């Protein structure tokens, strides 16, 4: 069916939704009044700094903080020894915040210090004496999978393989997805193209570095202000790491200067809380740019193999991929998402994807714009382009011939509902840009991509004020204009002007639990 622009027109005529009003945070941001993490302050505040390992892999034999603690202006020092035992699922989080037995990557935090000013804190950092035993390191995902690779965790056995291996390795997890008979599918192909790809880790590059302010009270309760994509997750994580009741910790999200998935976890927040607890004063920590790049999570680097078979008329008979993703020094690379996304745009009867979650001496990876999907999609789409060119087919026509649609079988089990891929491809081909002549130095590319959407837990409070305005309390930090979206929807449903709705991001003590702002979920979930 050819694309019909009229079919994409609104089913319902909206009065407010679809307009372009001034964002609730717009004026404050462009005039400099908005408060970001680094703008926060408190009476009696101390400055926190973090000592980081200069080695990619080293055993920590001893940490001597006595000289630093005796230095002028120093009020507290914190190491991993200050934190108690935590449940298994949080051990890696704590170890990433402060190294325990080993430094697992260059930039791994080893100790934190709180002093009366920046100069005193920086001077005291140089007085912390760490006795390192330097160990062999590995940073490349394929090198880490080799038989003779230096092991980050000598007791780690790969999960997902049956029967389980008897020897440890740097492969944390293995998975397989797919359906059909791949061998038979490749036998039926007239052309088979197999290619290998490597992608490097890419940092989110948010403009604002991580920043927080922690303040412990004498009764054991605490306040924490930080730039984050999910302050409820920060509350739950920090409370458990610091041995607190969740209700004793209130977290407030500051304005956020970019996140892109990289601010969905904790790095300096537990350290600031511990320093505040030990010193009895508020403690503020702001990462510098070197800290951000060395110690916070980029995407995974990868090594991938993709194989696709097609008939002469352009029908894909089989697809296969091997995906090796490194998750930094801790398990958790998003290889499963990569495997689920790789061939999602194509209707394949025969499909097999294998994935390896590999640890290396790098910072722990963090989410970045559809974590895991762009890498595997890049590999598959590159092969798809090559096949289309070999067949002499238009690249969109080849994709249309094989595109997933309602009822197509996904690699991970369910069948797709209405996804609109065919309509999108038809619209792209019908657009004048696709057939416009190219000037020297110009090119034109085509690719398909896939990502999930999920609801998650969300709580919103709506109150009618005495003056007739509407107060909206949201629990999802605004990283993409969600305050404006919520105001638009509230105004639409209540039949009032947009400027009569006021939205705030509430703290964790003022609203029910909210999941993080990620995965394109907030407008969908909070708007319901």
Name each model-derived stretch:
Residues 1-528:
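Structural alpha/beta core scaffold segments of enzyme domains
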